[in-house]
């Protein structure tokens, strides 16, 4: 699954900002504790025969399922997962024999189970469990859900499913755990004018009368329940052949012309993966289904043979799409298609090893994008992925990559930066350690050995070690996946003799909120090299001395494949600063990010990051300037509420970025590299957010001219320019944007316009956006994102509003996301009062076992306050020293 954050990818791109009244009550009642969700091990399903008849307008469906089961030991009852279902009949029949007496049906809503208790114990053997039931169609993206949207033909409704992690039980009474793999035969009785889609191709259609048809899909391979998919609506399907596999993109009717790049990309990626994994994709077809709308929780889902996405992550509308959108489409496909092997063909045994799915798919996404589109220069993005992980891993509420999971909510919260980004970074480090060929061979062995089965992490390590004899892969992997945290390698001394540089290294642990913590220990694969020499490698555990060929400046973690911080001494850092332009771009990024993190933690001067920004020429790689723009934007956020100091900082930041933007310009140049196109939008967004008068003025000029002169708002700039306008909007401009949103008929563009309404600096306009989010006008999938976007600039306002209107907001948030949604609204706050507010909310509404997100929000607020109070004075002093 491609995770999403509180603010959808659309909102983030529009806002150009990083993500991220409740009254504290005395002694609020504690939220109910959740029990473990794992089922008894007495029965195992082998096949589901499922028949559904959806009633889209009534938001309900009728279901009938016959499950072939093996009773593994005598039992008086059978327990499976079910939620929001009403059973009309339940029958258990031996494969050879007569049906048993009807069981007593007991529903446990809290534990999301149904238990069928029989008059006599059920003997071991094979049975068929037949159940007739009715279920609910939701309006948020879990279970079987409806999405309403507008197009040129009026209002439409489509149905889709989203089952990961634990929502197949809303569609089928089932053993809804990843280890219970079975085959599925799905039959759907649907309107004859609509298209039904599932994991497998349609095998047969039968007229069911009254304008209905029954669609029988071919039987699936053995798979986990969360990978089943069903979709229904007025769809188009564009197809192509990739070898023997039919690939398709399914869209709302009339939008398939926007699917060309996704379809072409699917063909390329499938060929690459068939080769890399050494096991051909086993299904006859592979669809990408693009739906209008968004979710707070995810942007795409790897259902086997029927990948679900939202339109913003799959389609390219020529009137609004950018180069970043194009790269995003490819990345989403590369991620979800990697899951067809890592996750679908081979699946983790339980959610504690979720990272086996997500970390690997994220790594494969980055690797494949860099290989198949080298012109995008995305290899540098690996440093940003590592930073996303370390930002989460450096605080007390972090957790190991392999983590304890007991409840549905804990499983939902496992989809985080540790699972995805740290998992990806650890894989990248291990591949670099054993070599790319040995790693690939180990992966092939793993896929072959465990196809159609379930695994734990050690199954992967075992196969990689077999492909890389003599390498302690399991030892290293255990250090980085079974314990939390970040190693820090201190460069104690550097001396050159006889053409070699001797580097003394000491390992400790990096944290940003526990300076006195006793450090953990890791076996860290370290790569060091001089500017022009060959790399030297060592496995560092405690202290190490490394001889590096050449006598020159030494970079530790050269190539940035290691998951650790590097802390240089003052003289060493000074040498790096003066030779900064000679470093490889990926090492420039790595040094910058280490400098930022170490400076904010008080381990080196916080102003060192500004020295690096000053040392960077305007001709540096676009990704370097994207990073600098991000750092400057982050520093600006710490001045929130202190106008005088903020204006001093903004003067410097704008002056630093303006020469780069002058070189890039407003207009694209023929033949310019793709990374420059991305940088242009980043600079416009950042300068607009910083209040650069020239950029704000030009953005407003283009906005006012767009109706008469379409060239004033080219597709490549439209979203970014409108974002600058919206951030700096007055009431009249906000009203105009609102009218545009109301009149727009294209769902993707409409969603973008509603997102724009939520990013204004003006508090009165932010309040109007919050009020609008509670109405039905934006649509349920946009409303929660609008509140989240307001939180990017006004976290206290957004949190207080959401909690004060919790009953209404709950209806607009995925049920799997609520424990994360509310606390994260506050995470960018600098107000100490928010700490107690978040704690009070968690005490009242969130089970103690599910409060990691709330605790993390509190930790982030505390960290931000500490940075503002203890680090920003050094930034002020640097600005004064340099005449800003």
What residue spans do the PLM features occupy?
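Gram-negative bacterial Sec-dependent N-terminal signal peptides
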Residues: 1-24
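N-terminal, polar/Ser/Thr-rich
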Residues: 24-62, 97, 153-158, 176-178, ...
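Surface-exposed beta-strand/loop patches in extracellular or lumenal glycoproteins
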Residues: 66-85, 185-191, 504-506, 510-527
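Hydrophobic alpha-helical and helix-loop surface patches within well-folded domains
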Residues: 67, 87, 110, 158, ...
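Extended, low-hydrophobicity, Ser/Thr/Pro/Gly-biased non-transmembrane segments
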Residues: 68, 132-235, 258-261, 404, ...
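A surface-exposed beta-strand-loop module
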Residues: 84-151, 173-176, 209-211, 543-549
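Beta-strand-rich binding/interaction modules
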Residues: 88-93, 473-474, 484-557
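Long, ordered, helix-rich scaffold segments
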Residues: 386-387, 499, 515-516, 529-538, ...
């Amino acid at each position: 699954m491609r995770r999403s954050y509180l603010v959808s990818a659309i909102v983030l791109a529009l806002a150009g900002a990083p993500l991220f009244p409740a009254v504290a009550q005395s002694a609020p009642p504690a939220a109910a504790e959740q029990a473990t969700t794992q089922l008894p091990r007495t029965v195992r399903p082998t096949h589901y025969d499922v028949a559904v008849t959806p009633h889209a307008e009534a938001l309900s469906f009728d279901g009938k399922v016959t499950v072939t089961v093996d009773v593994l030991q005598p039992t008086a009852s059978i327990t499976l997962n079910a939620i929001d279902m009403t059973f009309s009949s339940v029958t258990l029949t031996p494969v050879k024999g007569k049906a048993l007496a009807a069981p007593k049906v007991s529903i446990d809503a809290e534990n999301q189970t149904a238990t069928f208790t029989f008059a006599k114990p059920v003997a071991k053997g094979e049975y068929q469990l037949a159940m007739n039931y009715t279920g609910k169609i939701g309006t948020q993206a879990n279970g079987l859900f409806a999405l309403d949207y507008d197009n040129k033909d009026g209002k439409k409704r489509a149905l889709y499913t989203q089952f990961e992690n634990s929502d197949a039980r809303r569609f089928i009474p089932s053993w809804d755990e990843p280890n219970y793999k079975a085959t599925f035969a799905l039959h759907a009785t649907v309107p004859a004018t609509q298209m039904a889609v599932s994991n497998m191709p349609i095998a047969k259609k039968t007229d069911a009368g009254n304008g209905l048809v029954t669609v029988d899909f071919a039987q699936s391979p053995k798979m986990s329940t969360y990978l089943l998919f069903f979709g229904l609506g007025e769809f188009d399907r564009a197809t192509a052949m990739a070898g023997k596999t039919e690939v398709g993109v399914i869209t709302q009717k009339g939008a398939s012309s926007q699917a060309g790049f996704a379809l072409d990309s699917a063909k390329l990626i499938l060929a690459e993966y068939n080769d890399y994994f050494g096991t051909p994709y086993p299904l006859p077809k592979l669809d990408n289904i693009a739906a209008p709308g968004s979710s707070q929780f995810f942007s795409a889902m790897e259902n086997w043979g029927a990948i679900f996405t939202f339109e913003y992550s799959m389609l390219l509308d020529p009137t609004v799409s950018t180069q970043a959108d194009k790269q995003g489409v490819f990345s989403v496909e590369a991620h979800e298609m990697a899951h067809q092997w890592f996750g679908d063909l081979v699946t983790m045994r339980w959610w504690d090893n979720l990272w086996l799915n997500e970390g690997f798919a994220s790594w494969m996404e980055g690797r494949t994008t860099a290989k198949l589109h080298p012109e995008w220069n995305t290899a540098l993005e690996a440093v940003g992925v590592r930073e996303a992980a370390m930002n989460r891993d450096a605080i007390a509420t972090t957790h190991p990559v392999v983590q304890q999971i007991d409840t549905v909510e804990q499983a939902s919260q496992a989809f985080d930066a540790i699972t995805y980004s740290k998992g990806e970074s650890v894989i990248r480090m291990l591949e670099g350690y054993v070599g790319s060929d040995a790693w690939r061979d180990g992966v092939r062995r793993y896929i072959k050995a465990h196809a159609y089965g379930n695994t734990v992490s050690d199954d992967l390590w075992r196969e990689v070690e077999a492909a890389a004899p003599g390498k302690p892969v399991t030892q290293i992997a255990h250090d980085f996946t079974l314990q939390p945290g970040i190693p820090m390698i201190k460069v104690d001394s550097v001396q050159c003799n006889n053409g070699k540089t001797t580097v003394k290294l000491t390992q400790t642990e990096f944290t940003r909120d526990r300076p006195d913590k006793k450090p953990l220990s890791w076996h860290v694969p370290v790569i060091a090299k001089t500017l022009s020499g060959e790399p030297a490698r060592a496995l560092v555990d405690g202290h190490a001395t490394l001889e590096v060929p050449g006598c020159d400046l030494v970079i530790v973690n050269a190539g940035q494949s290691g998951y650790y911080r590097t802390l240089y001494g003052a003289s060493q850092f000074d040498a790096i600063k003066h030779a900064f332009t000679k470093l490889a771009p990926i090492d420039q990024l790595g040094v910058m990010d280490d400098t930022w993190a170490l400076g904010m933690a008080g381990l080196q001067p916080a102003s060192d990051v500004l020295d690096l920004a000053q040392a960077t020429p305007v001709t540096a790689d676009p990704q370097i300037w994207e990073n600098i723009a991000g750092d400057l934007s982050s520093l600006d956020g710490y001045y929130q509420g202190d106008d005088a100091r903020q204006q001093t900082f903004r003067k410097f930041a704008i002056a630093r970025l303006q020469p780069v933007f002058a070189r890039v310009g407003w207009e694209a140049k023929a033949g310019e590299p793709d990374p420059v196109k991305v940088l242009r939008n980043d600079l416009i967004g950042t300068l607009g957010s910083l209040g650069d008068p020239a950029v704000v003025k030009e953005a407003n000029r283009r906005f006012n001219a767009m109706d008469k002169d379409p060239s004033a708002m080219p597709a490549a700039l439209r979203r970014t320019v409108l974002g600058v306008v919206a951030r700096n909007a007055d009431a009249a401009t906000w009203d105009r944007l609102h009218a545009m949103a109301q009149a727009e008929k294209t769902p993707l563009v409409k969603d973008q316009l509603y997102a724009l309404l939520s990013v204004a600096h003006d508090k009165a306009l932010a309040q109007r956006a919050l009020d609008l989010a509670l109405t039905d006008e934006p649509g349920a999938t946009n409303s929660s994102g609008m509140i989240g976007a307001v939180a990017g600039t006004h976290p206290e306002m957004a949190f207080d509003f959401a909690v004060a209107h919790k009953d209404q907001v709950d209806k607009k948030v995925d049920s799997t996301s609520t424990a994360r949604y509310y606390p994260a609204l506050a995470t960018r706050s600098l107000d100490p009062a928010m700490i107690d507010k978040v704690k009070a909310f968690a005490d009242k509404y969130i089970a103690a076992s599910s409060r990691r997100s709330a605790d993390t929000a509190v930790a982030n607020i505390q960290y931000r306050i500490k940075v503002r109070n203890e680090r920003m004075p050094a930034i002020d002093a640097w600005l004064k020293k340099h005449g800003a």
